């Protein structure tokens, strides 16, 4: 008996009106993740994955390109409004927010969620170059 081929259903992308953009800006790289309101990732992009290597990865322009790529992928879900959460001290903080705004998203809120110790662990020793 020959099996009839079962067709896989085409996945319908859920329509999300508003979501959150998490920007992790370290000194070496910038990671932009766009999620829905529950925190489920819709799209993400990094400066390193956008073709920048080495010291060019840690530039504001690389963060801008990463934010544009993440925004382009998130537009397939019908995203209109984003709430931005910025984490880290890196150079790509402001430029990635501007790129999300220029991509057509309405930035409703910007929150800095960088962890600040209340005098916790001892920091690493100063660099001698």
Swiss-Prot record:
GO CC, any one term: ribonucleoprotein complex
UniProt similarity note: Belongs to the universal ribosomal protein uS11 family.
Protein name as annotated: Small ribosomal subunit protein uS11
InterPro entries referenced in this protein's UniProt entry, alphabetically: Ribosomal_uS11, Ribosomal_uS11_bac-type, Ribosomal_uS11_CS, Ribosomal_uS11_sf
Organism, scientific name: Psychromonas ingrahamii (strain DSM 17664 / CCUG 51855 / 37)
GO molecular function terms attached to this record: rRNA binding; structural constituent of ribosome
Binding partners and assembly: Part of the 30S ribosomal subunit. Interacts with proteins S7 and S18. Binds to IF-3.
SUPFAM superfamilies named among the record's database cross-references: Translational machinery components
Coiled coil: none
UniProt keyword list: Ribonucleoprotein, Ribosomal protein, RNA-binding, rRNA-binding
GO terms (BP aspect): translation
Function recorded in the entry: Located on the platform of the 30S subunit, it bridges several disparate RNA helices of the 16S rRNA. Forms part of the Shine-Dalgarno cleft in the 70S ribosome.
């Amino acid at each position: 008996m020959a099996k009839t081929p079962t067709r896989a259903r085409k996945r319908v992308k859920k329509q999300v009106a508003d979501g959150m953009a998490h920007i992790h800006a370290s000194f070496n790289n910038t990671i932009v993740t766009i999620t829905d309101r529950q925190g489920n990732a819709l799209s993400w992009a990094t400066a390193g994955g956008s073709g920048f290597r080495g010291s060019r990865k840690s530039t504001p322009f690389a963060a801008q390109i990463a934010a544009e790529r993440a925004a382009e992928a998130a537009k397939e879900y019908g995203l209109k409004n984003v709430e931005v959460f910025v984490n880290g001290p890196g150079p790509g903080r402001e430029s990635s927010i501007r790129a999300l705004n220029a991509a057509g998203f309405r930035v409703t809120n910007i929150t800095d969620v960088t962890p600040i110790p209340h005098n916790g662990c001892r920091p690493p020793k100063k660099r001698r170059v």
